[in-house]
Amino acid sequence: LKFPEQKRVFSMIPALHDAEFIRYGVMHRNTFLDSPRILNSDFSMKENANIFFAGQITGVEGYMESGASGLIAGINAVRRLNNIETITLPKETMIGALSRYIADESVKDFQPMGANIGILPPLEEKIRDKRERAAKHSACALDALEKVKVDFALA
């Protein structure tokens, strides 16, 4: 609500009718890139692969997601600087799935997204129990990360 409207609404409350408001509230705005048109899944720019973005501006939502994207972007910036192939984590991992989401050009109305099980690839078998399903997704992610360690000669 705009400031005059906030004053009007709050003043309708009998106990606040004569209150003096020192500061009114402001709405949080989330500014973000149209990442599918701008970024690759390694968090580098399509137009200039030497520039990396990370965090909320890329369209990942959440502290952990923003931090993880920063780690991947930072690792990839160093790898690019040293002429080493950049890493995109597997889609079975949450940050890998998010990095693919932000770079997916088929997404027409791009909106930020946080970590959620729905962006991971479906499991081969249906598992009804939520904890069991989460454990299976976790095992798949760890298996996929082992392959990354081999593919990119990481120890």
Residue ranges of each PLM-predicted region?
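Glycine- and aromatic-enriched mobile tails/lids
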Residues: 57, 76-155
